[in-house]
């Protein structure tokens, strides 16, 4: 009887330990497409949890939209929704993901993603560049992390597209697709940093 009780207690301890292990998951910057430069440091990682907010310069509606996109992506993966806040000039936010513009970044679609234990900064020359930085951050988060805190390694990521035109073709003239599929298709293009949706809408097989 005592042996059975010991087995039950041991199983409970193991289950509890495994459960606690699942409360934190580590992000991975090995994403597709792979950024041009990823430099990690030995500093403490940034902890992405339900207390994190996403900020953008107040008045910039495109960056606000990027922030809302990123908040939605994080909600899909973790189950919690980071609040989105606009910051006035000179304002700062602690333990936040901050979106901004940096004219010193050479490429119009380039971005720099910097991670410290205090926060994450995603800068781009344009709002498009910031969007691609958000996509890289999104892809680094485990796809299934419901209720978990995410550890994002400290360091910096610098990236810019190799090709100006990056797109995919979809022929809906010969092969019909429902509207929801097309929306999902466009989302997948954005996920992989493509910037052109080649939509083949009409055709005339009898044209000479």
Regions found by a protein language model. Name each.
Residues 21-165:
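Contiguous, structured surface segment used for ligand recognition
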Residues 124, 172, 180-181, 198-203:
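Glycine-rich, histidine-containing beta strand-loop boundary motifs that form or position
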Residues 62-63, 176-178, 204-208:
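Flexible loop/turn segments at secondary-structure boundaries
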Residues 155-177, 181-184, 190-192:
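An acidic-aromatic substrate-binding cleft motif
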Residues 1-30:
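Bacterial Sec-dependent N-terminal signal peptides
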Residues 192-208:
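Aromatic-lined carbohydrate-binding/catalytic grooves of carbohydrate-active enzymes
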Residues 4, 144-148, 194-199:
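Short secondary-structure capping/junction motifs at helix and strand boundaries
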């Amino acid at each position: 009887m005592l042996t059975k009780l010991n087995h039950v207690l041991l199983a409970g301890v193991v289950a509890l330990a495994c459960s606690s292990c699942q409360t934190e998951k580590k992000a991975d910057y090995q994403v597709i497409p792979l950024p041009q430069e990823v430099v990690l440091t030995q500093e403490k990682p940034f902890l992405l949890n339900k207390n994190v907010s996403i900020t953008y310069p107040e008045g910039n509606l495109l960056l606000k939209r990027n922030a809302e996109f990123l908040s939605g992506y994080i909600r899909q993966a973790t189950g919690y929704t980071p609040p989105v806040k606009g910051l006035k000039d000179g304002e700062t936010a602690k333990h936040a993901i901050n979106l901004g513009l940096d004219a010193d970044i050479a490429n119009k679609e380039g971005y720099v993603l910097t991670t410290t234990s205090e926060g994450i900064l995603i800068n781009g020359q344009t709002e498009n560049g910031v969007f691609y930085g958000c996509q890289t951050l999104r892809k680094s988060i485990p796809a299934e992390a419901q209720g978990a805190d995410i550890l994002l390694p400290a360091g910096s990521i610098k990236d810019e597209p190799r090709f100006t035109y990056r797109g995919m073709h979809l022929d809906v003239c010969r092969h019909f697709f429902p509207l929801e599929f097309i929306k999902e298709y466009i989302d997948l293009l954005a996920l992989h940093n493509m910037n052109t949706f080649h939509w083949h809408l009409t055709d005339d097989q009898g044209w000479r």
